[in-house]
């Protein structure tokens, strides 16, 4: 829905999950995980502030504070506001005309309602979505003593292009999901 990208995404995710739970008996409703990267990270981060349906979540390189990201200059030198007004994030009014709408659709400002264990990750050299989006969300969650772990990768851009980064991230995400969905004991980096 235009003007409410985070709430619309949450509605879609929850509707799809509920439909899958009704149609597939093999799905354990107590062992659901949610994972997303980039726009999917934005969706994942926000969704778990609105529901406790998921046992765990993983969000990579997402936008968690729309107000601060709006004026960010991305890799190609373009301001991020085009993504809101004309693209994926679908908030047609600019930040200065709909400030509250930008805050309402930001996971950062809903951290107090988040209970789902969350693994955040980002590349320190991400110039598409600044890694400070991840860092700020992490710090907000830590300040409220929420269950969160953050991985920051030096030399990584918006995605894991280097093989060793892909391997490390893949193994850590797999372990995170194994721990929270299958009860595998946590490795030291999880705590």
Predicted regions and their residues:
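Active-site-proximal cap/loop segments of hydrolase catalytic domains
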Residues: 1-191
